Amino acid sequence: MTQTLSQLENRGAFIERHIGPDAVQQQEMLNAVGAESLNALTGQIVPKDIQLATPPQVGEAATEYAALAELKAIAGRNKRFTSYIGMGYTAVQLPPVILRNMLENPGWYTAYTPYQPEVSQGRLEALLNFQQVTLDLTGLDMASASLLDEATAAAEAMAMAKRVSKLKNANRFFVASDVHPQTLDVVRTRAETFGFDVIVDDAAKALDHQDVFGVLLQQVGSTGEIHDYSALISELKARKVVVSVAADFMALVLLTAPGKQGADIVFGSAQRFGVPMGYGGPHAAFFAAKDEFKRSMPGRIIGVSKDAAGNTALRMAMQTREQHIRREKANSNICTSQVLLANIASLYAVYHGPVGLKRIANRIHRLTDILAAGLQQKGLKLRHAHYFDTLCVEVADKAAVLARAEAAEINLRSDIHNAVGITLDETTTRENVAQLFNVLLGDSHGLNIETLDKDVALDSRSIQQSMLRDDAILTHPVFNRYHSETEMMRYMHSLERKDLALNQAMIPLGSCTMKLNAAAEMIPITWPEFAELHPFCPPEQAEGYHQMISQLSDWLVKLTGYDAVCMQPNSGAQGEYAGLLAIRHYHESRNEGHRDICLIPASAHGTNPASAHMAGMQVVVVACDKNGNIDLDDLRAKAEQHAANLSCIMVTYPSTHGVYEETIREVCEVVHQFGGQVYLDGANMNAQVGITSPGFIGADVSHLNLHKTFCIPHGGGGPGMGPIGVKAHLAPFVPGHSVVQIEGMLTRQGAVSAAPFGSASILPISWMYIRMMGAEGLKQASQVAILNANYIASRLKDAYPVLYTGRDGRVAHECILDIRPLKEETGISELDIAKRLIDYGFHAPTMSFPVAGTLMVEPTESEGKAELDRFIDAMLAIRAEIDQVKAGVWPQEDNPLVNAPHIQSELVAEWAHPYSREVAVFPAGVADKYWPTVKRLDDVYGDRNLFCSCVPISDYQ
């Protein structure tokens, strides 16, 4: 049959690239599960009353090449001015060796958060290096493995200060007036929900205020001033006030460590260690504290432990502080952090080493000195005598200066009264300084860079002697041996080989949606048109960004059934927080601010109660019935009991039990009946897109995990994006921004992230995904995700009971395998199965969530039938091994499961096990072998012997 031109053009080609099983394989799996077609299967599983009649109209699919060309044209509308705005964002030079071998490498960006340390030793080592950089530069004892951005780190510092404060009746938090305005904005938002009073004043007046539990200082100040805070910090400490300092990595290369001056907490952005500005993100924040406060710190902490053979191994330490365990009692709701960006900063420090970093920092400071000297020589006044990279220059005719800057395609900081701010960076050259002279002084200034350089080199006093660092930094060998590109390339490859990512095998983590992150989706994030924009540049310079964000927002509105979308939250947890704040402020606008009860099902993800607590709500747990569904009788009873104070319910759909609950609309109606709002967690949106939608179901607000459903990669633990969709009545209450006032951001609410659009530079990934899939492709992706999960469940149910199912024994896009009966019979646990899967070349499914003693499997639509069969065969082979233990062939204390995973060195060591080496490392015909580099970790040892900095280099060899 002759094909039509439309068929030959094949505009939907990407759909077949993204979805794993082809049409023939889909039919084979449909036959296996007893369904005629994808539509028939969907019709059996999804409640009829919430099925959409037609898919949301987001356009037809485009080819990879057409979508890239379209987005390139949009990106071309951005104007790439040279930005000296500063305020925590500077241009960088990302070493090409890191760009190519890490940022553009799926071995790094497709990995998951390192909950399974045996398959994560490479990125754990890179994160440990990041912590070491943080410790060396801050002068403190304990560091985390990144937070979301500097502003949210400030809010976390405030919350932590209150937790550790000995002044239990104090309720005021002091913020120095020269912190970055976006930081103050986020601090105020968080303080409101916690009921703290925020005082903003000159740092010198911090001692004038009473009932202060914590103080936030900035080093270097937002307008450039270097402060010697030693005496102030000493006096504050004498009053038992917890002192936090917002700092800058590059400045700390030259300046005295805040920890040495007595600070309790030091945090800041690691952006200028090689991470592009990206119109606001993503960037990793660093966070450090004194050892005595370590158990009150937020975020992931990487610790050094031992494996079962006594070898040094790394793991995430002290997880009992975190939301997935402590829920509403957690230190923070943080789930995803910024691992990929922290690792860029970490490797930037490794590549340059202490000598290279000092050269960069000194060059930046020298050029700043030259600029300052020339301006002062011509009669201009500097606001601050002591500075590192930022000058606050008083100008008589500010409008003329800004006009000359615009003509030269230069951005200066313009929000300072009668002055402009100028922040130099590692990309600044002597030619740039000469151009700045022209902008500030006119063309006839007559200044000579060489002459000025000689003068300032002999007599620079812009950094106080007391503030010059006098201790060595980055002395560990890892920062002093990989400075040639060959060495660096091999070091990064050695780390990558230790890890298991999507470029090697499926990662069947339930509730995580580890789907394909296509190369075409990733390409635009490194385009300079997107990567090099300052988040506070004039809006007319970011028209391409605004068009792309507007289109993406419009698509998400249609896909969710909501009326508006806010792109600011830069993680799913932040999205939850922002959505709950919208609900809180909505109630307040109706004079019902007393509504603070948040109903949460017992099956909920730990971020839900943690976010509710952060939003100032009280959590009331709703029971689930024996089938895993929300108990409607218990819901009605508790909604009625708390009717006067009911704020909302947080519910996930499909449920965290992997089922489309038939009564979801009734749940919404009950909550609405008693005056509450419905927050529908978007964690499982991958089973909704094109089939149903939160708005159609009856919800009022949701966050979307763009790093799950819409293809932003997990990056080994971040970045993420968590925009919120809202119904019209909540739209006035989404986060706003105090620095950037642009269309779509005109709400009067406080910010939840540092930048107006959060991690804007990764939004092109989701734009590309939706553009290339189109309406039909997106629906098909959801349907195949459901098919794949049901195929796995149907083939494994006889070996491992599927804990919860819906109508006709079906599951949604994931299934929970119940390991508890096997454990009772044999002693083999879900942990043993998870570790044994490593020997078969797989990352484990989600363990013991949402039910202890289970494994939750989510294959996504991107995995083909061959990979699904490989996983199923591995699980069946493991079940046969368990039967060997049950039959007494292998003892409970010595078998391939309890000893898993097995490593290469065991092959040549003495072998005393009752099973062969072949069974250990090449079970059931495994051919394409992934080799873990450590055996099972000793979690108890790691937490009892907490060590969170680089170990001797001999331990890595």
UniProtKB/Swiss-Prot annotation:
State any single GO MF term: glycine binding
Instruction: Give the keywords, sorted.
Output: Oxidoreductase, Pyridoxal phosphate
Concerning Pfam families, the annotation shows:
GcvP2_C, GDC-P
| EC number, as in UniProt | 1.4.4.2
Offer a single GO CC term for the protein.
cytosol
Q: Which SUPFAM superfamilies would you find in this protein's record?
A: PLP-dependent transferases (SSF53383)
Cofactor names from the entry are: pyridoxal 5'-phosphate
Give the modified residues of type N6-(pyridoxal phosphate)lysine. Answer: K708
InterPro entries in the cross-refs: GcvP (IPR003437), GDC-P_C (IPR049316), GDC-P_N (IPR049315), GDC_P (IPR020581), PyrdxlP-dep_Trfase (IPR015424), PyrdxlP-dep_Trfase_major (IPR015421), PyrdxlP-dep_Trfase_small (IPR015422)
Q: Which reaction does this enzyme catalyse, per its entry?
A: N(6)-[(R)-lipoyl]-L-lysyl-[glycine-cleavage complex H protein] + glycine + H(+) = N(6)-[(R)-S(8)-aminomethyldihydrolipoyl]-L-lysyl-[glycine-cleavage complex H protein] + CO2
Q: Name one GO biological process term.
A: glycine decarboxylation via glycine cleavage system
Record's subunit section: The glycine cleavage system is composed of four proteins: P, T, L and H.
Q: What does this protein do?
A: The glycine cleavage system catalyzes the degradation of glycine. The P protein binds the alpha-amino group of glycine through its pyridoxal phosphate cofactor; CO(2) is released and the remaining methylamine moiety is then transferred to the lipoamide cofactor of the H protein.
Report the HAMAP family cross-referenced here: GcvP
Q: Which family does it belong to?
A: Belongs to the GcvP family.
Q: What is this protein called?
A: Glycine dehydrogenase (decarboxylating)
The scientific name of the source species is Salmonella newport (strain SL254)
